[in-house]
Regions:
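Short, solvent-exposed secondary-structure boundary motifs
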Residues: 61-70, 85-92, 126-142, 177-188
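Gly/Pro-enriched, hydrophobic low-complexity segments
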Residues: 153-245
């Protein structure tokens, strides 16, 4: 029983860590603010936005290459809730302006004096992937089976069968915590399900369910299911549900 209590304590530490990640102000939601910084600095403070910029520039490979050179890149970014405007300067004649409003990414850029405009719809699956990545460390592409159910106001994405290359990564935080308590412990994740609910672009619910198999001192084994739940609104408060197991 003492060993089991120590294991549960380690789970709570992991849950608090995930809750801290989920409660971070990813979009500067407290109030609209303007930032002028290098891309790597912005990456550290607004990862959701920068990931959107890097992922959804769908046209110019050279432009993407320049964007990835964070040491030479500067951005000016205005964030307001889930909407943002970003301008990326690449020399005197080349620039990109992104405007992300209500699920649509508008892109305008100038390349050697030629102005180009386009817009791209961001799908529920795309949003879910980014939300999941910053809420739990996983993306929907980390699963081999993905189901999307959409109604008028709600989209629900269910991800099953986690890819084998992510199993060790998912088990690592708990493994590290338990190694501080036990000399000989092995943690294995044999099942994980990620459920993401998006409603009216107003709030999101992310639920990660993990089934762990834990072996202590080579003999005593435990099978534990842990559920991490988090709910938050764009630009508003984040609500973290109590972890359950």
């Amino acid at each position: 029983m003492r060993q089991f209590r120590k294991i549960i304590g380690a789970f709570l530490v992991i849950a608090i860590t995930l809750c801290t990640i989920a409660s971070c102000d990813l979009l500067g939601g407290k109030k609209p603010e303007e930032l002028t910084a290098t891309a790597d600095e912005i990456l550290a403070t607004t990862p959701y936005t920068v990931e959107m910029l890097l992922k959804y520039d769908a046209n110019d490979a050279d432009m993407l290459t320049a964007m990835s050179d964070v040491a030479a890149t500067e951005m000016k970014l205005t964030v307001d809730g889930s909407n943002f405007v970003g301008k990326l300067a690449l020399g005197e004649e080349n620039y990109i302006i992104y405007t992300f409003v209500d699920g649509t990414l508008y892109t305008e850029w100038s390349e050697n004096g030629t102005d180009v405009q386009e817009k791209k719809e961001i799908t529920a699956e795309d949003k879910a992937g980014l939300l999941a990545e910053f809420g739990t460390g996983l993306k929907y592409t980390d699963f081999s089976e993905v189901e999307v159910a959409s109604a008028k106001d709600v989209s629900v994405i269910t991800c099953r069968n986690i890819n084998s290359d992510k199993v060790a990564e998912l088990a690592a935080p708990l493994q590290a915590q338990l190694e501080e308590v036990f000399d000989d412990v092995v943690v294995t994740v044999y099942n994980a399900t990620l459920d993401i609910e998006l409603e009216n672009d107003s709030y999101n619910v992310i639920v990660l369910t993990c089934e762990y198999f834990i072996t202590v001192n080579g003999s005593t084994s435990y099978s534990v299911e842990m559920t991490y739940s988090m709910k938050y609104s764009y630009g508003k408060d984040r609500e973290i549900m109590a972890p359950s197991f």
